[in-house]
């Protein structure tokens, strides 16, 4: 059960990373802010992977074609998911953007059943539907809540893409070295972030060089986002190498109250009592899905 505290730590680092990324969103835009976590996270991910490789007894690496395919697919999906999540946060609020991303639980169930042949119980499906209903009510536009056009669509797209890339990363980690999940996960993070840095950095260099300039200007804040992003990814990948994605995502719902606290302290955002109630309903649904 060590994957549970690992997941809790991953959720905390992820909230810190999202807050740091959101702070550079204005000048760099969603794609520039997305590059922050990969470009400035890669040095930290490389150090983490190197240390893990050195301290792992008898590592047996298998960088096979399925490993590279899973890494490439997951990397592309995560880039799109991160940009969609930041767009949702920018058009609504930090906490609501994070809550919308949690719709990835239901998407994870759908992808698992359709693409990976997962056998899903009735309780798990019910929990997924309850969680989705709670999130829909939580994020429904209200008079006192700023919600610009496209926020919900971007948030749901983020959840769908994150759910699919999580399964890709789990497959990559298990393929690389299933006997050493932590080391395998950290090496996978390094490879994925290198691919993402090259792909997104090259894209911005050609299409939007001004965004690259803004990212470089915000290097102090970006270093914090990079470290937190590399730490969060390493912990998430490790937990998913030890346990199914659905269970990890269920425990990771702790990210929602953490995001609400962060949004209140850092961005002066507040959730209403009704939103908090529906947030709890969503959390109950997530727990049902995990325990089903």
Please provide the spans of the model-predicted regions:
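Membrane-interface interhelical linkers
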Residues: 1-73, 80-92, 133, 141-160, ...
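Hydrophobic core positions of alpha-helical segments in small-molecule transporters
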Residues: 9, 36, 100, 123-126, ...
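Membrane-embedded alpha-helical core segments of multi-pass
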Residues: 13, 17, 77-84, 104-111, ...
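Small-residue-mediated transmembrane helix hinge/kink sites in multi-pass secondary transporters
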Residues: 22, 86, 112-113, 170, ...
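Alpha-helical transmembrane segments of compact multi-pass small-molecule transporters, enriched
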Residues: 39-45, 100-114, 195, 199, ...
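Hydrophobic transmembrane alpha-helices of multi-pass small-molecule transport proteins
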Residues: 45, 109-116, 123-141, 274-291
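Membrane-helix interface motif
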Residues: 50-56, 164-177
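Membrane-interface helix-loop-helix junctions at boundaries between adjacent transmembrane segments
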Residues: 85-123
């Amino acid at each position: 059960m060590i994957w549970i505290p690992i997941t809790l730590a991953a959720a905390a680092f992820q909230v810190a990373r999202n807050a740091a990324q959101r702070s550079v969103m204005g000048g760099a835009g969603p794609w520039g802010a997305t590059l922050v976590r990969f470009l400035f996270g890669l040095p930290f991910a490389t150090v983490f992977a190197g240390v893990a490789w050195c301290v792992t007894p008898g590592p047996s690496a298998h960088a096979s074609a399925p490993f590279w395919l899973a890494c490439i697919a997951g990397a592309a999906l995560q880039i799109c998911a991160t940009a969609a999540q930041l767009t949702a946060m920018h058009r609504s609020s930090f906490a609501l953007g994070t809550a919308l991303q949690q719709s990835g639980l239901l998407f994870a169930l759908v992808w698992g059943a359709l693409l990976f042949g997962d056998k899903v119980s009735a309780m798990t499906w019910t929990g997924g539907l309850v969680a989705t209903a709670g999130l829909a009510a939580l994020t429904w536009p209200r008079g006192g809540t700023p919600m610009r056009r496209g926020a919900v669509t971007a948030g749901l797209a983020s959840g769908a893409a994150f759910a699919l890339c999580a399964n890709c990363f789990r497959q990559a980690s298990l393929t690389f070295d299933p006997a050493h999940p932590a080391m395998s996960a950290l090496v996978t993070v390094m490879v994925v972030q290198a691919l993402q840095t090259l792909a997104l950095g090259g894209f911005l260099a050609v299409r939007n060089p001004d965004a690259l300039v803004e990212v470089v200007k915000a290097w102090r804040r970006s270093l914090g986002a990079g470290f937190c992003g590399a730490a969060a990814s390493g912990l998430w990948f490790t937990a998913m190498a030890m346990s199914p994605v659905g269970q990890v995502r269920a425990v990771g719902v702790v990210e929602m109250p953490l995001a609400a606290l962060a949004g209140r302290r850092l961005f002066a955002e507040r959730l209403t009592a009704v939103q908090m109630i529906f947030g709890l309903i969503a959390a109950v649904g997530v727990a049902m899905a995990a325990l089903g």
